Structure formats: structure tokens, C-alpha cells
Amino acid sequence: MDLTNLRAKYTTRGLDIKDLDQNPFKQFETWFNEAIEAKLTEPNAFSLATVGKDMMPSIRTVLLKIFDEKGFVFFTNYKSTKANQIKENPKAAALFPWLDLERQVKIEGDIQKISTTESLKYFLSRPKGSQIGAWVSHQSQVISSRSLLEQKFDEIKNKFVNGEVPFPSFWGGYIIKPTKIEFWQGGQDRLHDRFLYELKENGAWSISRLAP
């Protein structure tokens, strides 16, 4: 299939450094709120890239659940492929593709587990079905059929029908602690605007314009 003529024409006015907040987390919050206001589908969905000791990169979509100036938090099974890769190489990259706004945000940094207390707090906020789902799915393992998953779901649902679903020790959150955050805005004639925030040793952030 020849896709050489499949292209979009960017129409936004562009982005200037004077438009940016000096704090990348505040800039992210501004863009994130604008993505919500634009009614984008799951604006908190992002692609997470990790690399294990075999040096083969892996990428998948996960959901951002918390962010502040400490970092960006998502939740997963601690026995999953991504968790094993993070254990072997605690570095990650994330990409938020807000394409309807002609924007994307790329984040790179260190990654680590959050505390059990923080993970428990979020687990208790989830719908009961999602809590059960965390117990049912041995993430990334081969299964024989979907019906097996559904059977296990029903078994656990019946087991805890009159009580709380216990917190699984193999499930919890990770936080990406960024060292680089790049904001990309589409521009006419492919003259896109890219600004890179980099964390310095003194804790301050520098801002540089990058060629598109």
C-alpha cells in the first residue's frame, strides 16, 4: 500500500517560547486541560516505551492517573513484561499524542515503583469490576481462551460478592521522574515547533528550541 500522499495539513498558529511556562509540569497541565476541553478521547492515554536487558524496545498504551511536580504515575501488574523490563532497566519514555490539537508531549526519565500506600489508595478508588480484573489477569502470560478469563472473573466476583476485594501485592503504580520533557506543536509546511525542557543538576529546567 502506497501512503506517500496520505498527509495532514497543519493549521495552528505555532508555538513561541514566550507562550511557555518556565515550569514544564505547569505547561503540561495547561495542555492537558486543553485536551480535556477539546473532548479528546482519553487524553490521559500515552504510549510507554521500555527496554529490558535484551535491548529490544517494547511499547504499549497505558493511562496516566496522577501527575504533579514529582512525576507521572500509571498502574499495572508488577509481573508484566513492562514491569520486568523496568526492573532490568529503570528508564522509560512516554508519548502523549494529542493529534486533534496538532500536539504531542514526549517525556523521558527514570522510573520506579510508588509506595504500597499510594497504590492501595488508588486501588480502593477503582470500580469493583476493575479491582477484580487486577486479580484475574496474569498480564502478558499466554492463555487458552477468553472464556477462561471470564470464568475466573465470575469465580472471584462470587467470592467477594458481599465484601471488599483485597489489594493484590503484585499490582501497583510506577512513577516516571522526568529529566526531559518535549512539547511539539504542528506547523505549516512541516515547520513544526519543538521545545525541550531539560532538568539541570541544580534542579532548574532549561528550555531549548529544537529543529523540527
UniProtKB/Swiss-Prot annotation:
Reactions listed under catalytic activity: pyridoxamine 5'-phosphate + O2 + H2O = pyridoxal 5'-phosphate + H2O2 + NH4(+); pyridoxine 5'-phosphate + O2 = pyridoxal 5'-phosphate + H2O2
Cofactor note (record): Binds 1 FMN per subunit.
UniProt GO BP: pyridoxine biosynthetic process
Matches recorded under InterPro entries: Pyridox_Oxase, Pyridox_Oxase_CS, Pyridox_Oxase_N, Pyridoxamine_oxidase_dimer_C, Split_barrel_FMN-bd
Ranges that cross the membrane: none
Cofactor: FMN
EC annotation from Swiss-Prot or TrEMBL: 1.4.3.5
Pathway named in the protein's UniProt entry: Cofactor metabolism; pyridoxal 5'-phosphate salvage; pyridoxal 5'-phosphate from pyridoxamine 5'-phosphate: step 1/1; Cofactor metabolism; pyridoxal 5'-phosphate salvage; pyridoxal 5'-phosphate from pyridoxine 5'-phosphate: step 1/1
UniProt keyword list: Flavoprotein, FMN, Oxidoreductase, Pyridoxine biosynthesis
Quaternary structure annotation from Swiss-Prot or TrEMBL: Homodimer.
Family indicated by similarity: Belongs to the pyridoxamine 5'-phosphate oxidase family.
The name this protein goes by in its record: Pyridoxine/pyridoxamine 5'-phosphate oxidase
Organism the protein comes from: Aliarcobacter butzleri (strain RM4018)
